[in-house]
Amino acid sequence: MTVSELNEQAKSLLESHFPSIEVVGEISRFTRQPTSGHWYFTLKDEKASISCAMFKSTALRVKFIPKDGLKVIITGKVSIYSPTGNYQIIAASMKLAGEGELEAKFSALKQKLSDEGLFAEEYKKPLPKFPQKIAFLTSLSSAAYQDMLRVARDRFALVKIDAYSVFVQGENTASSVISALKTADKKDYDCIIIARGGGSKEDLWGFNDENLARAIFAAHTPVISAIGHEIDFSISDFVADHRSLTPTAAMMDLLPDVNTLLQDLSGADNFLINFINSCFKKCENALNVANLSLKTKSVDSKILKFENDLREGESKLENFIKFRLSNFENRLNLNTQILKSKAKFFEITKNLVSISKDGKIVKLKDLKSGDNFEISSQEISKQAKIL
């Protein structure tokens, strides 16, 4: 028997006896081949280690970036690399150790709150059609926050936005959001948006907190949960009055499009004109019918009756037209005044800047000579240094 034959037989034996196994261990010596995209690493515990390989097509399905020191669960088959005789695992899937425990906790809490009725539609508060004042509960240094501001300005610049900085990752997430939520709920907002961009299950775990869920349910203000991406679900999503797929989608779900509103007003004007023309046409037809009827019936009584009917119809039509015109005029004046005031506000504030150092917002007086920092406005960011 040759070495090659031995290795091939050993490979066949291992793969037939261990076609699918699940192994828990810590990643070390992780590398990604730049040309093939395959992953190679060692899985170890306190007493032993084994080489592992994961091919690119499989690695693309992993929802996190592996790194040395991570404890993971590998599913795959045991094999031998024939050219060298190295014993290894060909990984078919990888998940973080403890992920199954998190899923169990998530399912248990979801069932508990559902049984208590916290997810029931009857308790969901409707979102306002034309919100004038809303609150963001998010990280003010995040891309999600900037995206929400941009979409809000594009769709409905009349809305006033207050932002509350909260932790969106880590053990302080729930308490931070609860505190901000209770504060915002007392300030007469039309809606409160809890938002965070995408991340791993562990990154988003703070939004699966029972106390946070109960705080959202108890809020008097309508609450939108916009946590992660479309495939991410949190307990906050289920208990909130509305779940948006992403923070950007939350703005599109909540705010009307000003261009659509203007088109609706134009359509209403056309409807009113057509309605008035229709009324006049009906009156004209009625007069023609009356004229024919007068030829065969009492002239005096018919004239009197049609004069009364005509005056009554004229009065109703006049009152209706005045009502509709007054209604449209009031709506147009209101929107015009709001638009002017908000446009002035955005014009005044567009040149305001924020100062951040090492990713955190700081005060100008706290900077020292030699400090590097970033100056950011709504439109641009620049790096600077104190001389």
Curated annotation (Swiss-Prot):
Primary localization class, coarse: cytoplasm
EC number: 3.1.11.6
Annotated localization: Cytoplasm
A GO CC annotation given for this chain: cytoplasm
Gene Ontology terms: biological process: DNA catabolic process
InterPro entries: Exonuc_VII_L, Exonuc_VII_lsu_C, OB-fold_nuc-bd_dom
One function term, GO molecular function aspect: nucleic acid binding
CDD domains: ExoVII_LU_OBF
Keyword field contains Hydrolase: yes
Enzyme class: hydrolase
The entry's keywords: Cytoplasm, Exonuclease, Hydrolase, Nuclease
Reactions it catalyzes: Exonucleolytic cleavage in either 5'- to 3'- or 3'- to 5'-direction to yield nucleoside 5'-phosphates
Quaternary structure, from the entry: Heterooligomer composed of large and small subunits.
Homology family: Belongs to the XseA family.
Described function: Bidirectionally degrades single-stranded DNA into large acid-insoluble oligonucleotides, which are then degraded further into small acid-soluble oligonucleotides.
Protein name: Exodeoxyribonuclease 7 large subunit
Organism: Campylobacter hominis (strain ATCC BAA-381 / DSM 21671 / CCUG 45161 / LMG 19568 / NCTC 13146 / CH001A)
